[in-house]
Regions:
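Generic amphipathic alpha-helical segments used as scaffolds and interaction surfaces in large
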Residues: 36-46, 55-71, 90, 94, ...
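Signature of the SF2 helicase/ATPase Hel1-core->accessory helical subdomain module
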Residues: 84-112, 116-253, 353-362
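Residues that form generic nucleotide/phosphate-binding pockets
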Residues: 20, 33-37, 52-55, 79, ...
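Short glycine-/polar-rich loops that comprise or flank the Walker A/P-loop
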Residues: 2, 133-136, 344-346
Length: 362
């Protein structure tokens, strides 16, 4: 038995599809939506979604974007699909028939799973999707692409625009306060105490604001720009900020994860609508702090796999506003491949018509 594995973004989200296929105004309290754009733009779009829902409900369609003849433009698909941060997972009403999770269950029963390199790397990083690595025979075709795929998968980027960052921190402190008020955990994390959390977030914001000021000095004012640090070497002041940010964001990641786990255990005994809304919001916060923590840890490294870590800042214009981003990626990824693949999976075959070892095809 064999099956193909695809990323979450290739599958329709039945919760989103139900909302977009409905002829009634979205019942926010019933479906526990956040600020998602889950209303059809016009009647034609609603009818298209209703047809998709009919096909899904009658098993004529498996929910995979590539497996329907109905034209779905990118904007509509963005609203029909979901990502990890916006998924309720086992807490969702549609979990049992969700195309993504149905496919995941099929993977566990399959003898052969076909997936692209990027999905394999992501699966090994998160220890999800694919069967237990110890039970795998992994065949990597077109193996000469593996370093590039690994490099892309391990690149970390995050927005660090000071006002935007302030908003995210304010939203998180309010979210924690709501959890403490409505779904108080049995054991209160020390960082969840308002005074301590506010001081923590204030220090984090001040570091981000300082980093904004320093990075903007390297780029022409008031326009899109980019600055790359030669050989990945950061000025001492910037390096110290990155090291402190790595610690502070990791602590917030841990706090978000703790609350998310606690909320997920309460689903059988509390107001399910309010609880699901908080789970979604906390899941998104966790995703943000997870990415930030990885970014600043990588930025704090002088080298990875014995080679410099590329570090650069960009300023981009979006909807008339300038946004500042910071990026990191290792030039060489041998250590990461060692950790994710070579040490984890006992049997690996790499095939390629152009693969060389020590510059030789033999």
């Amino acid at each position: 038995k064999f099956t193909a594995a695809f990323g979450r973004g290739r599958y329709v989200c039945p919760r989103n599809l139900t909302a977009l296929a409905s002829t009634e105004p979205t019942q926010q309290d019933l479906l526990a939506f956040l600020d998602d754009e889950l209303t059809p733009n016009n009647q034609e779009e609603q009818k298209r979604c209703a047809k998709l829902k009919g096909d899904l409900d009658t098993y004529k369609w498996d929910g995979l974007r590539d497996h329907t003849d109905i034209a779905i433009d990118d904007d509509l698909w963005r609203r029909l699909s979901t990502d990890k941060a916006s998924c309720l997972n086992r807490n969702c009403y549609y979990y049992r028939e969700c195309p993504f999770f149905v496919a995941r269950r099929e993977i566990q029963e399959a003898e052969v799973v076909v997936a692209n390199h990027a999905l394999v790397m992501a699966a090994m990083e998160s220890e999800a999707v694919l069967p237990d690595p110890k039970n795998l025979l992994l065949v990597l075709d077109e193996g000469h692409h593996l370093p590039d795929v690994a490099r892309d998968a391990l690149e970390m980027s995050a927005e660090i625009t000071a006002p935007w960052y302030r908003l995210q921190l304010d939203l998180f402190t309010k979210l924690v306060a709501t959890c403490m008020e409505q779904f108080r955990p049995k054991t209160i994390p020390p960082l969840a105490i308002p005074e301590r959390l506010n001081a923590h977030c204030e220090e984090l914001y001040e570091l981000i604001a300082s980093l904004n000021n320093i990075l903007n000095l390297y780029m022409p004012a008031g326009q899109e720009a980019e600055h790359r640090f030669a050989m990945g070497e950061l000025p001492d002041e910037v390096l110290e900020i990155c090291q402190r940010l790595a610690k502070l964001t990791e602590m917030l990641r841990g706090l978000a994860e703790l609350f998310l786990n606690d909320l997920s255990e309460k689903t059988g005994s509390h107001d399910i609508v309010r609880l699901h809304r908080l789970i979604l919001q906390m899941n998104r916060a966790l995703g943000m702090f997870e990415a930030q923590s990885k970014l600043w840890r990588l930025a704090s490294l002088a080298q990875s796999s014995g080679a410099p870590v590329t570090k650069w800042a960009t300023r981009e214009e979006r909807e008339g506003q300038l946004h500042l981003w910071f990026h990191c990626v290792g030039i060489r990824v041998s250590d990461q491949l060692e950790r994710l693949l070579w040490r984890s999976i006992p049997h690996i075959i790499v095939t390629s018509a152009t693969l060389r070892s020590l510059n030789s095809f033999s």
